[in-house]
Amino acid sequence: MSAAVSRHISVLGREAVEFLAPRAGGIYVDATFGAGGYSRRILAVAGARVIGIDRDRTAIAEAFDLVEQAEGRLTLVQDRFSQLDEVCASQNAPQVDGIVMDIGVSSMQLDRAERGFSFRQDGPLDMRMGQEGASAADVVAVASEKDLANIIYIFGEERHSRAVARAIVRARQEKPILTTKVLADIVASVVHTRPNDIHPATRTFQALRIFVNEELDELQSALHASERTLKPGGRLVVVTFHSLEDRIVKNFINARASRGGGSRHMPDVERTAPSFEILTKRPVVADENEIAANPRARSAKLRAAERTANASHDADTSFDWPTLRTVMKGGRA
Protein backbone atom coordinates (compact mmCIF):
# COMPACT_ATOMS: atom_id res chain seq x y z
CA MET A 1 0.00 0.00 0.00
CA SER A 2 1.38 3.43 -0.91
CA ALA A 3 2.03 6.20 1.60
CA ALA A 4 -0.69 8.29 -0.04
CA VAL A 5 -3.25 5.56 0.51
CA SER A 6 -2.21 4.92 4.10
CA ARG A 7 -2.48 8.65 4.95
CA HIS A 8 -6.01 9.01 3.64
CA ILE A 9 -8.75 9.20 6.27
CA SER A 10 -12.36 8.67 5.24
CA VAL A 11 -14.57 11.47 6.50
CA LEU A 12 -17.44 10.35 8.76
CA GLY A 13 -16.36 6.77 8.07
CA ARG A 14 -17.82 5.26 11.23
CA GLU A 15 -21.13 7.07 10.87
CA ALA A 16 -21.43 6.26 7.17
CA VAL A 17 -20.97 2.53 7.71
CA GLU A 18 -23.29 2.53 10.73
CA PHE A 19 -26.07 3.91 8.53
CA LEU A 20 -25.14 1.46 5.77
CA ALA A 21 -25.50 -1.39 8.32
CA PRO A 22 -23.55 -4.04 6.35
CA ARG A 23 -24.23 -7.71 7.02
CA ALA A 24 -22.85 -11.06 5.96
CA GLY A 25 -23.97 -11.95 2.45
CA GLY A 26 -24.84 -8.36 1.55
CA ILE A 27 -23.51 -6.56 -1.52
CA TYR A 28 -22.43 -2.94 -1.07
CA VAL A 29 -21.20 -0.29 -3.48
CA ASP A 30 -18.41 2.11 -2.56
CA ALA A 31 -19.25 4.43 -5.43
CA THR A 32 -16.30 6.80 -4.93
CA PHE A 33 -13.63 4.31 -3.84
CA GLY A 34 -10.64 6.65 -3.52
CA ALA A 35 -8.31 5.09 -0.95
CA GLY A 36 -10.95 2.56 0.07
CA GLY A 37 -11.70 3.86 3.55
CA TYR A 38 -15.39 2.98 3.49
CA SER A 39 -14.68 -0.34 1.77
CA ARG A 40 -12.31 -1.38 4.56
CA ARG A 41 -14.99 -0.76 7.15
CA ILE A 42 -17.59 -2.71 5.17
CA LEU A 43 -15.19 -5.60 4.56
CA ALA A 44 -14.60 -5.81 8.32
CA VAL A 45 -18.04 -7.45 8.42
CA ALA A 46 -17.42 -11.10 7.62
CA GLY A 47 -19.12 -12.20 4.42
CA ALA A 48 -19.96 -8.71 3.14
CA ARG A 49 -19.03 -8.07 -0.50
CA VAL A 50 -18.00 -4.69 -1.96
CA ILE A 51 -18.05 -3.32 -5.49
CA GLY A 52 -15.72 -0.32 -5.56
CA ILE A 53 -15.97 2.28 -8.34
CA ASP A 54 -13.54 5.07 -9.16
CA ARG A 55 -12.90 6.98 -12.38
CA ASP A 56 -9.27 7.51 -11.34
CA ARG A 57 -7.15 4.61 -12.59
CA THR A 58 -4.45 5.49 -10.04
CA ALA A 59 -6.87 4.81 -7.16
CA ILE A 60 -7.73 1.42 -8.66
CA ALA A 61 -4.08 0.48 -9.19
CA GLU A 62 -3.04 1.44 -5.67
CA ALA A 63 -5.72 -0.74 -4.05
CA PHE A 64 -4.07 -4.00 -5.17
CA ASP A 65 -3.14 -4.99 -1.59
CA LEU A 66 -6.68 -4.43 -0.31
CA VAL A 67 -8.12 -6.55 -3.13
CA GLU A 68 -5.78 -9.39 -2.15
CA GLN A 69 -6.64 -9.06 1.54
CA ALA A 70 -10.36 -9.18 0.78
CA GLU A 71 -9.98 -12.66 -0.74
CA GLY A 72 -12.59 -12.29 -3.44
CA ARG A 73 -15.00 -10.02 -1.57
CA LEU A 74 -13.80 -6.78 -3.22
CA THR A 75 -14.21 -6.02 -6.91
CA LEU A 76 -12.87 -2.75 -8.32
CA VAL A 77 -14.11 -1.12 -11.51
CA GLN A 78 -12.72 1.99 -13.18
CA ASP A 79 -15.77 4.01 -14.20
CA ARG A 80 -17.81 7.07 -13.32
CA PHE A 81 -20.04 6.64 -10.30
CA SER A 82 -22.96 7.91 -12.36
CA GLN A 83 -22.77 4.53 -14.11
CA LEU A 84 -23.07 2.51 -10.91
CA ASP A 85 -26.23 0.71 -12.04
CA GLU A 86 -24.49 -0.53 -15.18
CA VAL A 87 -21.36 -1.45 -13.22
CA CYS A 88 -23.40 -3.48 -10.73
CA ALA A 89 -25.26 -5.26 -13.51
CA SER A 90 -21.93 -6.18 -15.12
CA GLN A 91 -20.87 -7.74 -11.81
CA ASN A 92 -24.02 -9.88 -11.60
CA ALA A 93 -25.41 -7.61 -8.89
CA PRO A 94 -28.29 -5.68 -10.48
CA GLN A 95 -29.73 -5.08 -7.00
CA VAL A 96 -27.56 -4.25 -3.98
CA ASP A 97 -27.97 -3.80 -0.24
CA GLY A 98 -26.28 -0.46 0.17
CA ILE A 99 -24.46 2.38 -1.59
CA VAL A 100 -22.06 4.89 -0.05
CA MET A 101 -20.53 7.86 -1.86
CA ASP A 102 -18.12 10.60 -0.78
CA ILE A 103 -18.45 13.51 -3.20
CA GLY A 104 -15.56 15.63 -4.37
CA VAL A 105 -11.80 15.42 -4.71
CA SER A 106 -9.87 13.01 -2.49
CA SER A 107 -6.89 13.97 -0.36
CA MET A 108 -4.85 11.54 -2.48
CA GLN A 109 -5.48 13.75 -5.50
CA LEU A 110 -4.96 17.02 -3.62
CA ASP A 111 -1.63 15.83 -2.25
CA ARG A 112 -0.17 15.19 -5.70
CA ALA A 113 0.99 18.34 -7.42
CA GLU A 114 1.05 16.64 -10.81
CA ARG A 115 -2.74 16.17 -10.68
CA GLY A 116 -3.24 19.94 -10.69
CA PHE A 117 -6.00 20.17 -8.08
CA SER A 118 -4.26 22.26 -5.44
CA PHE A 119 -3.19 25.89 -5.39
CA ARG A 120 -0.89 25.08 -2.46
CA GLN A 121 1.49 23.09 -4.68
CA ASP A 122 2.60 24.16 -8.13
CA GLY A 123 1.75 21.72 -10.88
CA PRO A 124 0.10 21.46 -14.29
CA LEU A 125 -3.38 23.01 -14.35
CA ASP A 126 -5.21 19.73 -14.87
CA MET A 127 -7.89 18.83 -12.25
CA ARG A 128 -9.24 15.82 -14.16
CA MET A 129 -10.20 12.92 -11.90
CA GLY A 130 -10.11 10.42 -14.73
CA GLN A 131 -7.37 11.95 -16.89
CA GLU A 132 -9.64 12.08 -19.92
CA GLY A 133 -11.39 14.98 -21.64
CA ALA A 134 -10.75 18.70 -21.26
CA SER A 135 -8.43 19.86 -18.47
CA ALA A 136 -8.77 23.01 -16.38
CA ALA A 137 -6.05 24.58 -18.55
CA ASP A 138 -8.18 23.85 -21.62
CA VAL A 139 -11.22 25.52 -20.05
CA VAL A 140 -9.24 28.57 -18.94
CA ALA A 141 -7.78 28.87 -22.44
CA VAL A 142 -11.00 28.45 -24.43
CA ALA A 143 -13.99 29.62 -22.37
CA SER A 144 -15.36 33.10 -22.99
CA GLU A 145 -15.17 35.70 -20.24
CA LYS A 146 -18.92 35.39 -19.70
CA ASP A 147 -18.73 31.59 -19.42
CA LEU A 148 -15.78 31.80 -17.04
CA ALA A 149 -17.67 34.24 -14.82
CA ASN A 150 -20.73 31.96 -14.79
CA ILE A 151 -18.65 28.86 -14.01
CA ILE A 152 -16.83 30.57 -11.15
CA TYR A 153 -20.02 32.10 -9.73
CA ILE A 154 -22.26 29.03 -10.01
CA PHE A 155 -19.82 26.27 -9.05
CA GLY A 156 -17.55 28.26 -6.74
CA GLU A 157 -20.11 30.68 -5.30
CA GLU A 158 -17.43 33.33 -5.77
CA ARG A 159 -18.93 36.83 -5.56
CA HIS A 160 -15.91 38.29 -7.37
CA SER A 161 -16.43 35.96 -10.33
CA ARG A 162 -16.58 38.71 -12.95
CA ALA A 163 -13.35 40.28 -11.76
CA VAL A 164 -11.66 36.88 -11.73
CA ALA A 165 -12.89 36.10 -15.25
CA ARG A 166 -11.62 39.45 -16.53
CA ALA A 167 -8.23 38.87 -14.92
CA ILE A 168 -7.96 35.40 -16.47
CA VAL A 169 -8.84 36.66 -19.95
CA ARG A 170 -6.38 39.54 -19.61
CA ALA A 171 -3.59 37.21 -18.45
CA ARG A 172 -4.14 34.56 -21.14
CA GLN A 173 -3.77 37.21 -23.82
CA GLU A 174 -0.17 37.61 -22.64
CA LYS A 175 0.67 33.91 -22.31
CA PRO A 176 -1.12 30.57 -21.72
CA ILE A 177 -2.17 29.77 -18.15
CA LEU A 178 -0.71 26.31 -17.66
CA THR A 179 0.09 25.88 -13.96
CA THR A 180 -1.81 26.02 -10.69
CA LYS A 181 0.48 28.68 -9.22
CA VAL A 182 0.01 31.01 -12.18
CA LEU A 183 -3.78 30.74 -11.92
CA ALA A 184 -3.74 31.13 -8.13
CA ASP A 185 -1.65 34.29 -8.44
CA ILE A 186 -4.03 35.72 -11.06
CA VAL A 187 -7.02 35.13 -8.77
CA ALA A 188 -5.21 36.53 -5.73
CA SER A 189 -4.51 39.73 -7.65
CA VAL A 190 -8.24 40.57 -7.71
CA VAL A 191 -9.69 38.66 -4.73
CA HIS A 192 -8.43 40.13 -1.48
CA THR A 193 -9.02 38.26 1.78
CA ARG A 194 -8.24 38.80 5.45
CA PRO A 195 -5.47 36.78 7.13
CA ASN A 196 -7.80 34.17 8.65
CA ASP A 197 -9.97 33.75 5.55
CA ILE A 198 -9.67 30.92 3.04
CA HIS A 199 -7.09 31.28 0.28
CA PRO A 200 -8.39 33.74 -2.36
CA ALA A 201 -8.18 31.05 -5.07
CA THR A 202 -10.18 28.45 -3.14
CA ARG A 203 -13.56 29.11 -4.74
CA THR A 204 -12.19 29.50 -8.28
CA PHE A 205 -10.29 26.22 -8.03
CA GLN A 206 -13.39 24.50 -6.63
CA ALA A 207 -15.46 25.85 -9.51
CA LEU A 208 -13.06 24.68 -12.20
CA ARG A 209 -12.70 21.24 -10.61
CA ILE A 210 -16.46 20.75 -10.40
CA PHE A 211 -16.92 21.99 -13.96
CA VAL A 212 -14.09 19.96 -15.54
CA ASN A 213 -15.30 16.74 -13.91
CA GLU A 214 -19.01 17.53 -14.40
CA GLU A 215 -19.42 16.69 -10.74
CA LEU A 216 -22.96 17.98 -10.23
CA ASP A 217 -24.25 16.18 -13.32
CA GLU A 218 -22.44 13.05 -12.11
CA LEU A 219 -24.01 13.37 -8.67
CA GLN A 220 -27.52 13.81 -10.05
CA SER A 221 -27.09 10.78 -12.29
CA ALA A 222 -25.55 8.70 -9.49
CA LEU A 223 -28.50 9.41 -7.19
CA HIS A 224 -30.95 8.27 -9.85
CA ALA A 225 -28.83 5.18 -10.53
CA SER A 226 -28.83 4.40 -6.81
CA GLU A 227 -32.61 4.58 -6.71
CA ARG A 228 -32.78 2.00 -9.51
CA THR A 229 -30.13 -0.28 -8.02
CA LEU A 230 -30.98 -0.52 -4.32
CA LYS A 231 -33.10 -3.40 -3.06
CA PRO A 232 -36.09 -2.61 -0.84
CA GLY A 233 -34.51 -1.96 2.54
CA GLY A 234 -31.19 -1.06 0.92
CA ARG A 235 -29.53 2.10 2.15
CA LEU A 236 -28.04 5.14 0.44
CA VAL A 237 -25.40 7.14 2.34
CA VAL A 238 -23.93 10.32 0.83
CA VAL A 239 -21.18 12.54 2.27
CA THR A 240 -20.86 16.01 0.72
CA PHE A 241 -18.45 18.88 1.30
CA HIS A 242 -20.15 22.05 0.08
CA SER A 243 -23.61 23.53 -0.19
CA LEU A 244 -24.14 22.84 -3.90
CA GLU A 245 -23.70 19.09 -3.45
CA ASP A 246 -25.64 18.96 -0.20
CA ARG A 247 -28.56 20.83 -1.74
CA ILE A 248 -28.77 18.33 -4.60
CA VAL A 249 -28.72 15.35 -2.21
CA LYS A 250 -31.22 16.93 0.18
CA ASN A 251 -33.65 17.82 -2.60
CA PHE A 252 -33.36 14.37 -4.19
CA ILE A 253 -34.04 12.50 -0.95
CA ASN A 254 -36.83 14.84 0.15
CA ALA A 255 -38.57 14.59 -3.22
CA ARG A 256 -38.47 10.80 -3.12
CA ALA A 257 -39.50 10.52 0.50
CA SER A 258 -42.84 12.21 -0.21
CA ARG A 259 -45.74 11.13 -2.35
CA GLY A 260 -45.93 12.91 -5.71
CA GLY A 261 -48.64 15.53 -5.92
CA GLY A 262 -51.82 14.57 -7.70
CA SER A 263 -54.82 16.48 -9.01
CA ARG A 264 -58.48 15.78 -9.74
CA HIS A 265 -57.42 15.03 -13.32
CA MET A 266 -54.49 12.78 -12.33
CA PRO A 267 -54.64 11.40 -8.79
CA ASP A 268 -51.58 9.88 -7.13
CA VAL A 269 -50.48 6.62 -8.69
CA GLU A 270 -48.14 3.92 -7.42
CA ARG A 271 -45.10 5.19 -9.32
CA THR A 272 -45.17 8.45 -7.33
CA ALA A 273 -45.30 6.71 -3.96
CA PRO A 274 -42.24 7.36 -1.78
CA SER A 275 -39.19 5.47 -3.02
CA PHE A 276 -37.06 6.40 0.01
CA GLU A 277 -37.50 6.84 3.74
CA ILE A 278 -35.26 9.50 5.26
CA LEU A 279 -32.91 8.25 8.00
CA THR A 280 -31.25 11.60 8.76
CA LYS A 281 -33.78 14.34 9.51
CA ARG A 282 -30.78 16.66 9.77
CA PRO A 283 -27.39 16.07 8.20
CA VAL A 284 -24.79 14.34 10.36
CA VAL A 285 -21.61 16.38 10.84
CA ALA A 286 -18.17 15.54 12.19
CA ASP A 287 -17.39 16.01 15.87
CA GLU A 288 -14.53 18.09 17.23
CA ASN A 289 -12.19 15.11 17.53
CA GLU A 290 -12.57 14.14 13.87
CA ILE A 291 -12.14 17.74 12.72
CA ALA A 292 -8.95 18.03 14.77
CA ALA A 293 -7.60 14.83 13.21
CA ASN A 294 -8.83 15.62 9.71
CA PRO A 295 -9.60 19.31 8.94
CA ARG A 296 -11.32 18.28 5.68
CA ALA A 297 -14.17 16.94 7.83
CA ARG A 298 -15.14 20.45 8.95
CA SER A 299 -17.48 21.05 6.01
CA ALA A 300 -18.75 17.47 5.63
CA LYS A 301 -22.44 16.60 5.82
CA LEU A 302 -23.86 13.09 5.73
CA ARG A 303 -27.37 12.24 4.60
CA ALA A 304 -28.87 8.76 4.52
CA ALA A 305 -32.08 7.17 3.29
CA GLU A 306 -33.56 3.68 3.01
CA ARG A 307 -35.11 2.35 -0.20
CA THR A 308 -38.76 1.38 -0.08
CA ALA A 309 -40.43 -1.24 -2.26
CA ASN A 310 -42.13 1.42 -4.40
CA ALA A 311 -41.12 2.09 -7.99
CA SER A 312 -38.39 4.56 -8.90
CA HIS A 313 -39.43 8.10 -9.75
CA ASP A 314 -38.75 9.63 -13.14
CA ALA A 315 -35.22 10.98 -13.45
CA ASP A 316 -34.79 14.75 -13.52
CA THR A 317 -32.30 15.44 -16.30
CA SER A 318 -32.83 19.20 -16.58
CA PHE A 319 -29.71 20.99 -15.36
CA ASP A 320 -29.58 24.78 -15.07
CA TRP A 321 -25.81 25.20 -15.01
CA PRO A 322 -23.11 25.56 -17.71
CA THR A 323 -22.00 22.28 -19.30
CA LEU A 324 -18.51 21.31 -20.38
CA ARG A 325 -19.61 20.40 -23.88
CA THR A 326 -21.39 23.70 -24.51
CA VAL A 327 -18.62 25.89 -23.13
CA MET A 328 -15.80 24.10 -24.96
CA LYS A 329 -17.78 24.12 -28.20
CA GLY A 330 -18.66 27.80 -27.88
CA GLY A 331 -15.11 28.97 -27.26
CA ARG A 332 -14.08 32.53 -26.61
CA ALA A 333 -16.50 35.41 -27.08
Curated annotation (Swiss-Prot):
Catalyzed reaction equations: cytidine(1402) in 16S rRNA + S-adenosyl-L-methionine = N(4)-methylcytidine(1402) in 16S rRNA + S-adenosyl-L-homocysteine + H(+)
Localization in the cell: Cytoplasm
Cellular component, GO, one term: cytoplasm
GO biological process, one term: rRNA base methylation
Domain of life: Bacteria
Uppermost EC category: transferase
UniProt keyword Cytoplasm present: yes
This protein's record includes keyword S-adenosyl-L-methionine: yes
Sorted UniProt keywords: Cytoplasm, Methyltransferase, rRNA processing, S-adenosyl-L-methionine, Transferase
Documented EC number(s): 2.1.1.199
Binding sites annotated in the UniProt record for S-adenosyl-L-methionine: 36-38, 54, 81, 102, 109
Broad class of where this protein is predominantly found: cytoplasm
GO terms of molecular function: rRNA (cytosine-N4-)-methyltransferase activity
Biological function: Specifically methylates the N4 position of cytidine in position 1402 (C1402) of 16S rRNA.
Similarity remark: Belongs to the methyltransferase superfamily. RsmH family.
Protein name per the record: Ribosomal RNA small subunit methyltransferase H
Top-level taxonomy: Bacteria, Pseudomonadati, Pseudomonadota, Alphaproteobacteria, Hyphomicrobiales
